[in-house]
Amino acid sequence: MHGLLLAGLLALPLNVLAHPTESHSSGVSRRAIDITSYRLPQISKYTKSDAVPKQDGESFTTSSTGDDNVSSGDYVTTATNWLKKTLPKATYRLVNDHYIGDSGIGHVHFRQTAHGIDIDNTDFNVNIGRDGKVFSFGNSFYDGEIPKANPMVKRDFSDPVNALHGAIQTLNLPVTAKPENVKAKPVEGKENFKFEGTSGALSDPKAQLVYLQKDGGLVLSWKVETDVGDNWLLTYVDANKNDQVHSVVDYVSAAEYQVYPWGINDPTEGNRTSIHLPWLKTLSTDWHIDGKGWYPTTRGNNAIAQENPTGHPEYENNYRPKSPLFIFKYPYSLAMTPPSSYRDASITQLFYTTNVYHDVLYILGFNEKAGNFQINNWNKGGVGGDFAILNSQDGSGVNNANFATPPDGQPGRMRMYTWNASTPERDGCFEAGIVIHEYTHGVSNRLTGGPENSRCLAALESGGMGEGWSDFFATAIRLKPGDTRATDYTMGEWASNRPNGIRKYRYSTSLTTNPHMYVDADGLTSVHAIGTIWASMLYELLWNLIDKHGKGDVTKIRPVLKNGVPTDGRHLAMKIVLDGMALQPCLPNFVQARDAILDADKNLTQGSNKCEIWKAFAKRGLGVGAAFNQTKRTGSNELPAGC
């Protein structure tokens, strides 16, 4: 998963949202290549709501549904004019993934261009408030000199096939591309190609000519896309020196059902029960239809779940349980072995947990417009065709899990493994926290920077927060009625057979039990280690809001909202964290993400929880005076005036 990390083992890089794995599948050789050394630079800026310059002139009104007598172009025009005013000399294009979220904020994203070519790691996101004015914005546009020579005139760049070979050779990719067999077929867009005649990748590799912002300048590069299973890579190969790789992004982050019900994290917390019609009314009707068919198996609009013992990429024809009566009840006990003997129960549990989480997130705002995972978007916005592919007992590894998040319109892919630290071995599908952790990688990658941009958590601190968000949601969902702020939680305890879980510290509001502070991130190179710090801050936030607003009935699945605002502190924390993801810039750092959460609360509740939020972050060193620096962060316990 972009997620769970076993102590003492190396974490997987970037977006392989994964725990370290004993993998025998295709992928980048970790011993030969450390792709984390090719991370994108962290250059984004975020202007929070109270720092946005005063605006004059006409505005429009958004609504929580975007259905007012207002055309979608109004807020896009406002955002475009803001960009023109802020950076009058910039050239850019509008990314076609703008939407008005359920919180009433319009989200608009732009990509900088030079000579009509994308500068691929430059983004400008504008958030338009309910009053029709700019609420906040993020910016990573290049402000240096644009190359005067247009490379398209003299065709001053290599053939894309050579760039593909450069990526394969430099990163030691398990892809075969013999020159006599490979053809670069043009597809829609300028200098955009799909390669035919290769083998080893899960889909045809692609290449697009782009600029990359690096070391204070622009380098012309081929962006080569290769999905090799454990890694789904964007490799930026120099357009002239094809043996030089400038950067790498990895999209992968390491009826009736008899299941462990929602809120039961693993078999130690409760028993399996039969649940009838568990889906929430979220416009998806039920989990087994997609507008084209009704499937009496673990397939539907949101997900398709199956076993995958070979670890191969094919999934359509893999085994999945079938029930003409839609009764998915199968035997399972902790003593059963081998795992294949309870594959039906495993697949059913994975399908159930993922679909419930999809529905909860939908109510909290991660819907079609925001880039969620659905085959059919029911004419509600976004791009369909992208349910989540869920592989139970995936044979490509053990002691791990991962989730790959391509842009909106392409299916996400979750691989759940078995864990062999106990006898008999354990199946990660039965630990809900692992499933939720992995799926949350898809959520944070789709929300940050817009649904069409899946590289916005590719920097070190951004990727760390991706791990932290995943741990946070997995923990918030498993709260029990008797829990208090004195309750501590682990991650991955059951599957790994480790009483203290797989993080350095338990999640706790006690600085004795968990002493993590912001400055602890200095010198860390693991996204999992950095993520534990971020999740520790969010755990403080969770309990500050619960102490103020209550937990609600944690035995109920459906969040209760009043005027779009969750009535309990648990779901309120989840909501403003989700909204903050959509507000923050591409490649955010801790300080920017904190400010985006404060802005999310300001928009949602008029800032009524400002002090609770500040106290959570300041307790762990992310107070008013905190400042980001890659190697030397500044910690602060200072609170703003009035708190």
UniProtKB/Swiss-Prot annotation:
Its EC number is 3.4.24.-. Residues 1-18 form the signal peptide. Residues 47-57 have a biased composition (Basic and acidic residues). It is an enzyme of class 3 (hydrolase). It comes from the Eukaryota. Residues 19-254 form a propeptide. Keywords: Glycoprotein, Hydrolase, Metal-binding, Metalloprotease, Protease, Secreted, Signal, Virulence, Zinc, Zymogen. GO terms for cellular component: extracellular region. SUPFAM superfamilies: Metalloproteases ('zincins'), catalytic domain (SSF55486). The active site is at residue 438. Binds 1 zinc ion per subunit. GO terms for molecular function: metalloendopeptidase activity; zinc ion binding. PROSITE patterns: ZINC_PROTEASE. Zn(2+) binds at residues 437, 441. GO terms for biological process: proteolysis. Its main location: secreted. It is found in: Secreted. Residues 58-69 have a biased composition (Polar residues). Glycans are attached at residues 271, 420, 603, 629. InterPro entries: FTP_domain, Fungal_virulence_M36, Peptidase_M36, Peptidase_M4/M1_CTD_sf. Residues 47-69 are annotated as: Disordered. Its cofactor is Zn(2+). Belongs to the peptidase M36 family. Secreted metalloproteinase probably acting as a virulence factor. This is Probable extracellular metalloproteinase 4. It comes from Arthroderma benhamiae (strain ATCC MYA-4681 / CBS 112371). The gene is MEP4.
